[in-house]
Amino acid sequence: MRVLLIEDDSAIAQSIELMLKSESFNVYTTDLGEEGIDLGKLYDYDIILLDLNLPDMSGYEVLRTLRLSKVKTPILILSGMAGIEDKVRGLGFGADDYMTKPFHKDELIARIHAIVRRSKGHAQSVITTGDLVVNLDAKTVEVAGQRVHLTGKEYQMLELLSLRKGTTLTKEMFLNHLYGGMDEPELKIIDVFICKLRKKLDAVSGNQSYIETVWGRGYVLREPDAEMRESA
């Protein structure tokens, strides 16, 4: 999961980064509202975490500008201001949720997962595709009840495919999701990851086809062919 953190307090930012990275999130941090706006417009994040007290501009202004710019990325406000007026104002400007500092790591992670699931159209933490089950909270994968052990990158790719099931994802989208524009390898690495992911799924699924190649475009996750499932 790719997270943009806009927070000017370096100690708090570092603490939040550690919380998120311990859950294998990719975190990109800035302490300036203007830069946060630029990054939010330019890159595809799963969620933006926004502090309200920034040195160059108000967090409310960051929020308002992003929404006026048609940036639909879910935004979670993290603020030391606990007044009901602050919460109402933040939600009114287009925030998806509001958390008051200090907060517990488990609650932050749970809120992030819930917000991202809703934004992707998944109210539940489990996405099922045929016999394939991806648990977004536990970060586990099963096929017909059998656990499939994936590397971090393999899981991130399958999670993205599951969240956008039925949508063709380009190799550039995978690279951006996995590396966020930092030290990106060549595009062909995506083919390697997909090949390994398919082999692991095939080994426990009776060669049911979940990940389809869309030649010249990318890859898409689809429900396995009904006849193939019946004959398996």
UniProtKB/Swiss-Prot annotation:
It holds the Pfam family Trans_reg_C. PROSITE patterns: OMPR_PHOB (PS51755), RESPONSE_REGULATORY (PS50110). Is phosphorylated by ChpT-P, likely on Asp-51. GO terms for biological process: phosphorelay signal transduction system; regulation of DNA-templated transcription. Keywords: Cytoplasm, DNA-binding, Phosphoprotein, Transcription, Transcription regulation, Two-component regulatory system. It is found in: Cytoplasm. Its main location: cytoplasm. SUPFAM superfamilies: CheY-like. InterPro entries: CheY-like_superfamily (IPR011006), OmpR/PhoB-type_DNA-bd (IPR001867), Sig_transdc_resp-reg_receiver (IPR001789), WalR-like (IPR039420), WH-like_DNA-bd_sf (IPR036388). One of its GO terms (molecular function) is transcription cis-regulatory region binding. Component of a regulatory phosphorelay system that controls B.abortus cell growth, division, and intracellular survival inside mammalian host cells. This signaling pathway is composed of CckA, ChpT, CtrA and CpdR. CtrA is a response regulator substrate of ChpT. When phosphorylated, directly regulates the expression of ccrM. Is also probably involved in the transcriptional regulation of rpoD, pleC, minC and ftsE genes. PANTHER family: REGULATOR OF RPOS. This is Cell cycle response regulator CtrA. It comes from Brucella abortus (strain 2308).
